[in-house]
Swiss-Prot record:
NCBIfam families: modC_ABC. It is an enzyme of class 7 (translocase). It is found in: Cell inner membrane. The lineage of its organism: Bacteria, Pseudomonadati, Pseudomonadota, Alphaproteobacteria, Hyphomicrobiales. Keywords: ATP-binding, Cell inner membrane, Cell membrane, Membrane, Molybdenum, Nucleotide-binding, Translocase, Transport. It comes from Rhodopseudomonas palustris (strain BisB18). Residues 5-238 form the ABC transporter domain. One of its GO terms (cellular component) is plasma membrane. Part of the ABC transporter complex ModABC involved in molybdenum import. Responsible for energy coupling to the transport system. Belongs to the ABC transporter superfamily. Molybdate importer (TC 3.A.1.8) family. It catalyses: molybdate(out) + ATP + H2O = molybdate(in) + ADP + phosphate + H(+). InterPro entries: AAA+_ATPase, ABC_transporter-like_ATP-bd, ABC_transporter-like_CS, Mo/tungstate-bd_C_term_dom, ModC_ABC_ATP-bd, Molybdenum_import_ModC, Mop_domain, P-loop_NTPase. This is Molybdenum import ATP-binding protein ModC. The keyword Transmembrane does not apply. GO terms for molecular function: ABC-type molybdate transporter activity; ATP binding; ATP hydrolysis activity.
Length: 381
């Protein structure tokens, strides 16, 4: 395997009973990488392979150039510096929350320069009030927060999360997601996050590995895979693209943020934020309409110059349009769904410049994408 620093390189190939796995990908060793696909496509199996719990001959894995396995070596699970969070918290019922958190933590971790400390984990995950309680008396969301804290205190080089919210109801998921976002904002620890819920992926992930039937369809930045018409995400009824945006201004009179994206500016209803802060936006294909000329007297606030990159038919009546923001067509990608009649009526074609009217912009709650640090400890330490 080629030694590439600051990247995760994986290639797992082999038969597991009747299931054939052929998964190869390279992603940055920073941020959150979502491993996404339908149930049974091999996502959890890939995590087990990364952890060394499943051994397939001839497979390879390396992170930051540190080879964990290849044709000549295989590091056992206990020798791999990973934290693993499962669907179920699996806490020790006879131990307190504090004892569960400290279980397995290296004794010399407090003296390591880049380690995350006990107090930092307590603060990040909001666990101070739970330390003396028994796991038996915790809610599902509290148990998962403790499990995440225990994984972090093992001082991992890589955090694996296998559908950590799948056993929780929607209300509890909404309670725990902000804590995961805080971890993303404050820690530089790479995470591989398995889910079949695209809403979780869109809210958390920076990069995406898209799987189907044991194979990797594509791997890359989240927005790039969302806007690729050759992949199933763009053709789905709820297709959308996520953007990283920078706050430029806030209008308290109307409660609107002005944010800059690659290729333009958007007005977003949102609470106040500081200039320079980063926010994640989501624009659904169904919330984008097209015009050949700048409209007048419209209620739509976000009207941006764009250029058609490509188009693909969706059945007999609709067309998926891939747009690039900005007059030069080199900005962020955006999706739109239009009827074939509208396409013909406007005489649209690839390469044409037009106006994209964005009727709705969703702001990820509490998400400040920040800047990624290089240390596994707290950002900016």
């Amino acid at each position: 395997m080629r030694d590439v620093s600051r990247s995760i390189q994986a290639q797992f190939r082999g038969a597991l009973g009747r299931f054939a796995l052929d998964a190869a990908f390279t992603v940055p060793a920073t941020g959150i990488t979502g491993l996404f696909g339908p149930s049974g496509c091999g996502k959890s199996t890939v995590l087990r392979c990364i952890a060394g719990l499943q051994q397939l001959p001839g497979s390879t894995f390396a992170i930051d150039g540190d080879v964990w396995q290849d044709a000549s070596q295989f590091r056992q699970p206990h020798q791999r510096p990973i934290g693993y969070v499962f669907q179920e918290a699996s806490l020790f019922a006879h131990l307190s929350v504090k004892a569960n958190l400290l279980y397995g933590a290296p004794r010399d971790a407090a003296h390591a320069r880049d380690s995350i400390t006990f107090d930092e984990v307590i603060e990040l995950l909001g666990l101070a009030a739970l330390l003396e309680r028994s796991p038996r008396h915790l809610s599902g969301g509290e148990r998962q927060r403790v499990a995440i804290g225990r994984a972090l205190l093992s001082q991992p080089k890589l955090l694996l999360m296998d559908e950590p919210l799948s056993a929780l109801d929607r209300l509890t998921k909404d309670e725990i997601l902000p804590f995961l976002e805080r971890l993303h904002e404050r820690l530089a620890l790479p995470v591989i996050y398995v889910s079949h819920d695209m809403a979780e992926i869109e809210r958390l992930a920076d990069h995406l590995v898209l799987m189907r039937k044991g194979q990797v369809l594509a791997a890359g930045p989240l927005a790039a895979l969302q806007s690729d018409p050759a992949l199933p995400l763009a053709a789905s009824r709820d297709a959308a693209v996520n953007f990283e945006a920078t706050v430029e201004d806030y209008d308290p009179g109307y409660g609107l943020l002005t944010v800059a994206v690659d290729g333009g500016r958007l007005l977003v209803p949102a609470p106040p934020a500081q200039r320079g802060e980063h926010r994640r936006l989501r624009i659904a294909a169904g919330d984008v309409s097209l015009a050949r000329e700048l409209p007048h007297n419209t209620s739509i606030l976000n009207v941006l110059p764009a250029r058609i990159v490509s188009h693909n038919p969706l059945g007999d009546s609709e067309i998926l349009v891939v747009l690039a923001l900005g007059g030069n067509g080199e900005g962020a990608r955006l999706l739109a769904r239009v009827t074939r009649r509208s396409w013909d009526h406007l005489e649209l074609a690839d390469g044409i410049g037009l106006i994209a009217q964005v009727k709705g912009v969703a702001l990820a709650p509490g998400r400040n994408t920040g800047t990624h640090a290089s240390s596994p400890g707290l950002r900016g330490r």
